[in-house]
Amino acid sequence: MLKIVKKLSILLVVCMVVSVLGSITAFADYPIFYQRYTADPSGLEANGRLYLYCSHDVYDPNNPNYIMNDITCISTDDMKNWTDHGEVFKASGWANYAWAPVVVARNNKYYMYFGNNATGIGVAVSDSPSGPFKDALGKALVNGSTPGVNPPSGFWCFDPGAFVDDDGQAYLYFGGNGEGNTRVIKLNGDMISINGTASKIVGPIFFEDSWIHKYNGKYYYSYSTNWSKGAPTIDYMISDSPMTGFNYKGTVLPQPPSNGNNNHHSIFTYKGNWYISYHNRELVRSRGITDNNAITYQRNVCIDRLYYNTDGTMQMATITADGLTQLKNVNPYITNEAETMAQESGINTEECSEGSRDVNNIENGDWVKIRGVDFGTGAVSFDARVASATNGGNIELRLDSATGKLVGTCAVQGTGGWQTWTTKSCNVSGATGVHDLYLKFTGGGGNLFNLNWWKFKTAPTEIIYGDLDGSGDVNAIDFSLLKKYLLGSISNFPSPNGLKAADLDSNGKIDVLDFVLMKKYLLGMITEFPAGK
């Protein structure tokens, strides 16, 4: 794969503010993912994470067109740092394309619906939200021959939107290229077969991009408009029924900046908040690419907060470049996958022999940014899982920018192969509090090394045996806590080191012997515990 141009724009475009009566500002992030060009995102909350499933734009200057043959999945638990799960589904067999996916969860499985260009919709299934997904039928689930579709001339059978209602009934929405070209059909409980015939939904100036969601008992059908009123927007309708009776309500997402074309969106919740995801073409522009075809056919996904008015209508989103709040800080003292990042320059990712993915294609000057890392009182060392078929290089640990404060440098030597892994360590000084962390890679020419994961370490803390509440003293409160633990009333102690501090005889478990030792200490029968000697 050709190396992506590395220089990123320092400043992303701050975009237009759209004012509508009764609306408030909603904030977006773009781009949120840099390793590949992606579009048509659909969101799913699963296992405490938000997953986005995206079309993957591959540009061929000899064939300027939308080339999308696989699906990229990314996920986050903080809305700033995104894990790259790679291409989780690849078109094959009957399907030559994989366009605009949607994923829903049911039966302890995950079902992906995708367009084979505009000729039909397939379904793939996985046991995990991060894939891999496998084609479930080896043929289209719906196409122009499906009962009730009755495709008029120019009908596009693509852009699926799937939805499982509260009563367990599932629906599939699809279609494109005309106001009367939306179709909805029921799915059976197996999610890979249809039930009955398709019905028509008519959306004013509908073009493509069907999406359905439910809010306060109402059904919201949203879609991309055509060019008849200017630049396409995301408009929506509301109904009391998932298949009929929709009433047009207006625009929820204006034409994004740096787009200049139609759009594709999804609306979903994560941790109680509503979001809308879509795409524009900011990433390719920020890299200084001027080829109009490359700009047209290489998109990037974005995400935005979404709000409702008291009457149930949706407020129009106002798009900004960096508006979302990071939901939690990154813990640097646990193993962090290298493919989880907020931004990068120059690198790629690939499947890793140790599982998951690794960062590869690392050359001199490349970097990875991790947003909002909480170093607390300070890190003293850094570990990195690396592999190199060459002479390696260095990982510079910098704060807040790629040229920011240097807090450590980890030297990486050759390991004999790009998947021959070893752990390298280095000392760290000056990393305290919350910062953006930059892993900056330096060395000679060509590819330097691959990176699987990283982790910081703190200085060892002194254990005060018997101090279970973290007060710095051993007293009756600690005795009471130990009693509660042994009775099963509590499963941990207020002190972060409480479980270790309660093992007073250092036999590897907390039991009645520790209780006796604590009692003797408080009665003055002993002055120290065996574990402290």
Where are these regions (language model features)?
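Hydrophobic alpha-helical segments, especially transmembrane helices
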Residues: K7-L8, L52, K484, K520
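Exposed boundary/loop context
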Residues: C15, E339, N348, I463-Y465, ...
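Cellulosome-associated attachment modules in secreted, modular CAZymes
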Residues: S19-A26, T461-K533
